[in-house]
Amino acid sequence: PDVELVAMADAFSDRIEKSLKGIQEHFGDEKKINIKEKNRFVGFDAYKKAIDSADVVILTTPPGFRPYHFEYAINNDKHVFMEKPVATDPVGVRKVLEMAKIAKEKKLNVVVGLQRHYQSKYIDLKKRIDNGAIGKIRSGQVYWNDAGVWVKKRKAGQSELEYQMRNWYYFNSVSYT
């Protein structure tokens, strides 16, 4: 449709370049990927510049930062898609709930990336179960097998803050573990 990717932001420039390359490889020579050099924002306040440049915001940052990025987006009347989890602690959860209420009052759309909830195979399976295709379910177990979570090795001269931000999955201040 009439959607164009116009800006990206990250605390680290190499992450923008790697992500942009992946998007371009996935979508090919798509004209709707229109991120000029001036719209590649780097730094701790980069999210503000990217949000200011857009109509709809996609928040895929480490979840420890997400409540504050969400707050900025809603306060600036932006529609938001954000990945799960939406926060990492009670303070962040309260912030997200508060901003979700404001978003609703402003009639802004907010969607959380619960990918399996929207995947057609899962939706079809749920319908079949609800319609009794396998009878009454008395119990069940679900497993999710994966190769594991990435680890970025510490680089020489890297600060503790940068190391933790690049390995956010393993640190409670920016993760959900």
Predicted features, each with a name:
Residues 1-78, 91-107:
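N-terminal glycine-/serine-/threonine-rich beta1-alpha1-beta2 phosphate-ribose binding loop
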Residues 10, 63, 85-86, 93, ...:
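Proline- and acidic/polar-enriched loop/turn elements at helix boundaries
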Residues 59, 82, 88, 110-112:
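Hydrophobic residues in well-ordered beta-strands that form the structural core
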Residues 77-79, 132-133:
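Extracytoplasmic "Venus flytrap"/periplasmic binding protein-like
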Residues 89-91, 120:
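Conserved PLP phosphate-binding loop immediately N-terminal to the Schiff-base lysine helix
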Residues 106-111, 116-176:
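Predominantly a Rossmann-like dinucleotide-binding segment in NAD(P)-dependent oxidoreductases
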